[in-house]
Curated annotation (Swiss-Prot):
Ranges in a coiled coil: none
Protein family membership: Belongs to the universal ribosomal protein uS2 family.
Keywords noted in UniProt: Chloroplast, Plastid, Ribonucleoprotein, Ribosomal protein
GO MF annotation: an example: structural constituent of ribosome
One Pfam family per UniProt: Ribosomal_S2
Subcellular location(s) of the protein: Plastid, Chloroplast
This protein's name: Small ribosomal subunit protein uS2c
Gene: rps2
Biological process (GO), any one: translation
Superkingdom of this protein's organism: Eukaryota
A cellular component term, taken from the record's GO annotations: mitochondrial small ribosomal subunit
Length: 233
């Protein structure tokens, strides 16, 4: 495993250790909980550092092989951070709303977007009654907004990185159905058993999410750079 991916001081400063109140916990997170303070569960940062290191090694290896990543985080306050980090490593992202069937029905959804865009470019909407034209334009605008981060994604991703398991549980379920590996931040109210690589951490604090996302993206970029260098050597 890569050493010194993150220090405990960095994790503490980013409030990664702060879980939820004890009465909101998921018992399956018990092995990742260090203690309870003032009725709030404290996450074991030693395990966080170790598992984040495992995840960083994994994404770097995949990036060296040219694999594609999809980042998912649809909470409004995460929209900008998620998009910026995904774009920093030339990866795909969903930061608005996860539409059911996005992965399990990917071919159909992708075809629908392409068909509407083609009709718009050909001026087809202008030949329709005003009400029908407005309806189709509204649908296309919605799909563009939701799928802005995956418009160039022509195939299913090789791995999906999820920020908020409870908010985007449907994404987790679709990945499991399609056997797409998942990396997921798991707070004390989450279920670590339904993802492939859990990273126990505070998924509510922006500083916590930003730190973990940043580390993963750094290692994806390292893998991508090594891949490019290997092509020229």
């Amino acid at each position: 495993m890569t050493t010194s991916v993150v220090t405990l001081s960095e994790l503490l400063a980013a409030r990664v250790h702060l879980g939820h109140r004890f009465n909101k916990w998921n018992p399956k997170m018990v092995s990742f909980i260090y203690a309870e303070r003032n009725k709030v569960h404290i996450i074991d940062l030693v395990q966080t550092a170790f598992l984040l290191g495992e995840a960083c090694d994994y994404v770097k290896l995949l990036a060296k092989k040219g694999k594609k990543f999809l980042f998912v985080g649809t909470r409004q306050e995460l929209n900008t951070i998620l998009a910026e980090e995904a774009e920093r490593c030339n990866s795909f992202y969903i930061n608005q709303r996860w539409l059911g069937g996005l992965l399990t029905n990917w071919v159909t959804i992708k075809s629908r977007v392409q068909a509407l865009e083609k009709k718009e470019s050909e001026g087809f909407f202008n030949s329709l009654p005003k009400k029908e034209s407005a309806r189709l334009k509204k649908e296309l605008d919605k799909l563009r907004r939701y799928f802005n981060g995956i418009r160039k994604m022509n195939t299913l991703p090789d791995v999906v990185i999820i920020i908020d398991q409870r908010k985007d549980l449907t994404a987790v379920q679709e990945c499991n159905k399609l056997n797409i590996p998942t990396i997921c931040i798991v707070d004390t109210n989450c279920n670590p058993d339904i993802v492939d690589l859990p990273i126990p951490a505070n998924d509510d604090a922006i500083c916590s999410v930003k730190l973990i996302l940043g580390k993963l993206v750094d290692f994806i970029k390292e893998g991508q750079i090594e891949r490019e260098l290997s092509k020229t050597s």
